[in-house]
Amino acid sequence: MNWHVAKRMGVVLAVALLAACKDDGGDGGGPDGGTTTASAGPGTGTSKAQPEGTPFTLPAGITLETPLKSFYVEDPRDCDDKDRDDAKGSGGAVTLCLIFRNTTGGPITVTLPPGLIIVSKDGSIQNGLLAQRVSIEVPPGERYFTPLFLYCANQDRATSGVGDEYALGPIIGYEGFQELYTLLEGKQLTRQAVTPIQLAITHLTNGEGLSDSDRAALKAL
């Protein structure tokens, strides 16, 4: 693999994602010069609270090494040399390496649902949101590595850096989110799709809801 080309592509994507995540339609200031709260619910937008939703559990026989950690996608030696071509999910504001163990004698499929939020252990780093359902077949035996790409859920926080720690959160279904999941269901997404999706998610997580242009862009993917 040409890591120089991959790195340049990764930088371009990261810049586009950051711009989309930061597109909050204003400067974040209140009328007195202070900050305003822009959030669809706990753990999204500017909220520092723990996300609320349906608990997520792994299938019997599957364990996941914790804490979950982000990794450097362009040099993925910390994720068993699996890169963006091996990744599940889309996005890129939060890039995690999941390490599973299957303690049974046969393969197990792990399904991660849309709306699953991965919670940063550092309040200055973004939580990550899964926008589409993904399935991961985990073979029996030793550690099985899977990169997972997620969208920015907090427009006022930094993107994930190497070694940032995360934990599995609940499946969130705040107002308007189910419409997003439905619009994206079953779509085969390209890297070019990431920016309009992130922009729509930023509108949702800030409590603004999807705009007509968001809906049109998502339907066109």
Model-identified regions with their sequence ranges:
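Short, solvent-exposed loop/turn segments enriched in Ser/Thr/Gly
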Residues: 91-98
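C-terminal motif of bacterial Sec signal peptides marking the signal peptidase cleavage site
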Residues: 17-20
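Bacterial signal peptide processing site
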Residues: 22-24
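Intrinsically disordered, low-complexity Pro/Gly/Ser/Thr-rich segments with frequent PxxP/GP/PP motifs
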Residues: 119-168
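Bacterial N-terminal signal peptides that target proteins for export
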Residues: 1-10
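Terminal connector regions
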Residues: 26-29, 147-200, 205-218
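Asparagine-centered strand-capping/turn motif at beta-strand->loop junctions
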Residues: 98-107, 112
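Low-complexity, acidic Ser/Thr/Pro/Gly-rich terminal tails and inter-domain linkers that flank the onset
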Residues: 28-89
